[in-house]
UniProtKB/Swiss-Prot annotation:
<dbReference type="GO" id="GO:0005875">
    <property type="term" value="C:microtubule associated complex"/>
</dbReference>
<feature type="repeat" description="WD 4">
    <location>
        <begin position="246"/>
        <end position="285"/>
    </location>
</feature>
<feature type="coiled-coil region">
    <location>
        <begin position="54"/>
        <end position="86"/>
    </location>
</feature>
<dbReference type="Pfam" id="PF00400">
    <property type="entry name" value="WD40"/>
</dbReference>
<feature type="repeat" description="WD 5">
    <location>
        <begin position="288"/>
        <end position="340"/>
    </location>
</feature>
<keyword id="KW-0206">Cytoskeleton</keyword>
<keyword id="KW-0498">Mitosis</keyword>
<comment type="function">
    <text>Positively regulates the activity of the minus-end directed microtubule motor protein dynein. May enhance dynein-mediated microtubule sliding by targeting dynein to the microtubule plus end. Required for several dynein- and microtubule-dependent processes.</text>
</comment>
<dbReference type="InterPro" id="IPR017252">
    <property type="entry name" value="Dynein_regulator_LIS1"/>
</dbReference>
<keyword id="KW-0853">WD repeat</keyword>
<dbReference type="GO" id="GO:0005874">
    <property type="term" value="C:microtubule"/>
</dbReference>
<protein>
    <recommendedName>
        <fullName>Lissencephaly-1 homolog</fullName>
    </recommendedName>
</protein>
<keyword id="KW-0131">Cell cycle</keyword>
<dbReference type="GO" id="GO:0051012">
    <property type="term" value="P:microtubule sliding"/>
</dbReference>
<feature type="repeat" description="WD 2">
    <location>
        <begin position="162"/>
        <end position="203"/>
    </location>
</feature>
<keyword id="KW-0963">Cytoplasm</keyword>
<dbReference type="InterPro" id="IPR015943">
    <property type="entry name" value="WD40/YVTN_repeat-like_dom_sf"/>
</dbReference>
Length: 417
């Protein structure tokens, strides 16, 4: 394979950085002369060769694993054909083939014991989040760092340093190229995740920044703060383009709607507000919680919630968790609470919908995660997840894994089955 001139230049500089970092001075001087490298290396080449090398090894392992799974799937497919006399594509309605597949998806929830327990942070974990495309996830902590991990092997990959106080939240853009983080240092940082480098620092909040999220387009991100405001930032320039004002206390979380035209925010003032992105006006105030509202999440598949009246299947549905220990389900269009889920014995800290939308997972200070059956509006399973408060939870959309983070400074990776 022939490399383009720019690729050759990047490879040569990565090699030069490797030689310099390892003290191979004679080899470095000879290499610079032979390759005609001029000037000093940019910081973006720091450790680049090692990163590429480990990435290649990880991808090779991934390819081998996928090939093995493909072989197993082909064998299973062949055995099914032999057993029933026709292919899966020809399965008749009610034959049970698709039903079994659906049941496997429904049952794919975290099961004990934890596959891996990861340590490395020196303070409580504040957020865990899967990458939208790669087999890695990130963890944020009160130790002011963000760490990158391989969820299939449990191996540590990298540490992102730059914040000077507790990192409160992280978010990936839809492409997975950019990571946003926010901190008690009053800053929002934008990282190029492909090279693990901070490319922008966004300033403007006057207090702890507690939440950050990208709009679905990826062109803008929003942040919420203890200064009682929400700010919208243009990713390409880093400029603040809008400020949303209305909450009377610390805003704990902000989340854009699936279409990106609305924002939902929750606060210490016990309310949830729905905002128009275009006009910046608050359209609805949702009241009902009796304590701080810690977390919110939009239902991305309301049509799958067949416990609701059919007239509501196209509604905008939002779920919220509070220090009052309850989870509330809201119809945003008409501003009413549809039902309340009760079961946790302490603050509800994080809410995540299962990929198919019919289950909800919650993390709590009662040290558990709960799986809720939304059709029957009851707790389907309780998992004793950590030895201390469970602060964060995420479910992978592409692979059968879940992750949790805790005040006990550990991260657990769970198999979903």
């Amino acid at each position: 394979m022939v490399l383009a001139q720019r690729q050759k230049e990047e490879l040569n500089r990565a090699i030069a950085d490797y030689l310099f970092a390892n003290g191979y001075v004679k080899a470095l001087n000879a290499f610079r002369e032979e390759s005609q490298l001029a000037g000093e290396n940019d910081r973006k080449y720091d450790g680049l060769l090692e990163k590429k090398w480990t990435s290649v090894i990880r991808l090779q392992k991934k390819v081998m694993d996928l090939e093995a799974k493909l072989n197993e799937a082909e064998k299973e497919f062949q055995s099914m054909q032999n057993a029933i006399g026709f292919g899966v594509a020809g399965a008749a309605p009610g034959s049970g083939l698709s039903d079994r597949s659906d049941r496997r998806d429904v049952d794919a929830i975290p099961r004990p014991p934890a596959k891996f327990t990861l340590t490395g942070h020196r303070s409580p974990i504040t957020r865990v989040l899967f990458h939208p495309h790669y087999n890695v996830f990130v963890s944020a902590s009160e130790d002011a760092s963000i760490k990158v991990w391989d969820y299939e092997t449990g191996e540590f990959e990298h540490t992102l340093k730059g914040h000077t106080d507790s990192v409160q939240d992280v978010a990936f853009d839809p492409s997975g190229k950019f990571l946003a983080s926010c901190s008690a240092d009053m800053q929002v940082k934008l990282w190029d995740f492909t090279i693990y480098q901070c490319i922008k620092t966004l300033t403007g909040h006057d207090h702890n920044v507690s939440s950050v999220a990208f709009l679905p387009s990826g062109d803008f991100l929003v942040s919420a703060s203890r200064d009682k405001t929400i700010k919208m930032w243009e990713v390409s320039t880093g400029y603040c383009t809008k400020t949303f004002i209305g909450h009377t206390e610390w805003i704990r979380s902000v989340r854009p709607s699936p279409e990106g035209n609305l924002l939902a925010s929750c606060s210490n003032d016990h309310t949830i507000r729905i905002w128009s992105v275009e006009s910046r006006e608050c359209q609805v105030v949702l009241r009902g919680h009796e304590h701080v509202v810690e977390c919110i999440a939009w239902a991305s598949h309301p049509q799958n919630l067949n416990s609701l009246p059919s007239s509501m299947n196209s509604s905008l549905l939002l779920v919220s968790g509070s220090r009052d220990r309850t989870i509330r389900f809201w119809d945003v269009n008409i501003g009413i609470c549809l039902f309340v889920l009760i079961g946790h014995d302490n603050w509800v800290r994080q809410l995540v919908f299962h990929p198919h939308g019919r289950l909800l997972l919650s993390a709590s200070d009662d040290k558990t995660i709960r799986v809720w059956d939304l059709k029957n509006r009851r707790c389907h399973k309780t998992l004793n997840a950590h030895s201390h408060f469970v602060t964060s939870l995420d479910v992978n959309r592409l692979a059968p894994y879940a992750i949790t983070g805790s005040v006990d400074q550990t991260i657990h990776i769970w198999d979903c089955r």
